[in-house]
């Protein structure tokens, strides 16, 4: 967390004062490292500090503030831009406020010890991460990340051509995700992690499909379904590792998160290529302007339904896999 603080602080200041592309690139790299280190530190901290459904509840509420921050930030940014005339560069200063607050909260605090003896050793972590279950979860994680971040990067831009307001879609999606994650523990208690993930995949598929077929006000309905679908992906994939592969420890949770981010970074350029290809096909049919952008973009969104669609199959397999697994295999070994 100390590294995260310095990476965030330096990255934010560099972002404000940078006057060239390289400076902006380094600034965003530092902020990204800060984000990654924050999650890498806090996920295992929560897993070690709580047990059972309380852990699922707190993991979901920790991840609640990722979309929650986006929702609050988008509304504040819109207010400062439209009502106060404050430019984007000047708005970046606000990022230092939560940075200083979390530094105050964490510095000097004692961290909980690992609940599982093997989770505290590198050898135990690596051995657990080479099991079929962990590798299967890693595949699922890559697809959940693409299903969440893939459409999110393009939906606002594409559907703005149909009359939908991109900032409203962003705030609606992020806000609903935050609310859903607040109640994530209750959902896990009722349907179990795999049941929640399976239901999420179904809703995400419906949401992306509606994004690809609907325009105007119906885009907001699609945003609601999509938000409810992707809300539980990330925190419950992390929680799945913590509860079902406990010996992988903090390293396992960090690796799973890294797999998700890596998959997203790999597929974003591919998705961009799909948009270019669909745009060329739509242009060949005589479409131009906003109609061209909308038709080509929605064609790409339709292609993206394949990712959450595959997850429906994988999470169904995982549901029966874990249900038929011996209870003893899932219980962590008590630390000495």
Regions found by a protein language model. Give the residues of each.
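Helix-to-loop junctions at the C-terminal end of transmembrane segments
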Residues: 1, 180-193
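C-terminal ends and interior cores of transmembrane alpha-helices
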Residues: 6-19, 203-214
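Helix-loop junctions at membrane interfaces in 12-TM secondary transporters
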Residues: 16-27, 212-222
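Cytoplasmic helix-loop-helix junction between adjacent transmembrane helices
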Residues: 27-64
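Helix-loop-helix hairpin linking two adjacent transmembrane segments in secondary transporters
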Residues: 53, 58-114
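Symmetry-related core transmembrane helices of the 12-TM Major Facilitator Superfamily/SLC fold
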Residues: 89-108, 298-320
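Extracytoplasmic gate region of multi-pass secondary transporters
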Residues: 127-178, 265-272
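C-terminal transmembrane helical hairpin of 12-TM major facilitator-type secondary transporters
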Residues: 195-237
